[in-house]
Amino acid sequence: MFLDERLEKILEILKNEKKVKVADLAAKFNVSEVIIRKNLKRLEQEGKLKRTHGGAILLKELAHSSTLEERVINRTKPKEIIARKIIENIQNGETVFFDITSINYIAAEYLANSQKEITLITNMPSITTHFNKNSKIIIIMIGGEYNKEIGGNVGIEAINYIKKYNVDKAFVGSAGIDLEAGKVMNFEANDGNTKKEIMNISKKIFLATEYRKLGILGNYKFSNLSDFDTFICEKDKKDFLESYKKIFDKSEVEIL
């Protein structure tokens, strides 16, 4: 097993069990306790855990804010996988809402290159650059105050525009998901309240974000996990930690 893979596995165990022991990890990974201590020291330096006598405990990780442009540039494999899953769950004739996320930005690119015929509503102006005059996608742009940090239109004016519509499906992102409390979070109230209204007008609501966001905290709770119908990430349900599966099952949220 490579070092990075072992570090990821250690964090997964920590998220599941909240604490680990050096001896147990050494036995599990068939390496020396010296190596495990070095691994835990590195993870502590990265702010992922706190070392204790003979082991370590989990630190709750806070989400870090960045602009939409920065997130789009950071076009990771998980984002690509999620974007493709989004397109697979859109059918011809539907009206769909894309929330302001880098994943939805990528999904819009795939949508523009597909043969799908839908109506796309969004409050993220930058995605319109993907669609040319030959596109079969009808685009409705939500107006309102443009937030440069978030990369889209949010706040009371945007909310009033959104209230005028009904959609079949909405794809919403988040900065983090507090699984213990069942809270879905972002960074600030205007964006959060806009997301709430997007959810209010949707028949089916998808939470589309990376697996690593599970257990990360944002600044503002905009929804409960149980308010969503489906969770889309880069992993299949069989690859989730058992404790995570139980939380999603209890919340009656499907995992794709």
Language model segments and positions:
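Conserved phosphate- and dinucleotide-binding cores of soluble alpha/beta proteins
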Residues: 2-5, 12, 21-25, 78, ...
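Active-site catalytic microenvironments in core metabolic enzymes, especially phosphate/sugar-handling
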Residues: 125
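HTH-adjacent hinge/linker in prokaryotic transcriptional regulators
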Residues: 2-23, 28, 34-100, 109-119, ...
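Short N-terminal helix-initiation segments at or just after the protein's N-terminus
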Residues: 30-41, 63-66, 117, 148-152, ...
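Conserved SAM-binding loop
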Residues: 120-121, 187
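Conserved SAM/SAH-binding loop
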Residues: 104
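Short secondary-structure boundary/hinge segments and terminal tails
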Residues: 61-62, 107, 180, 216
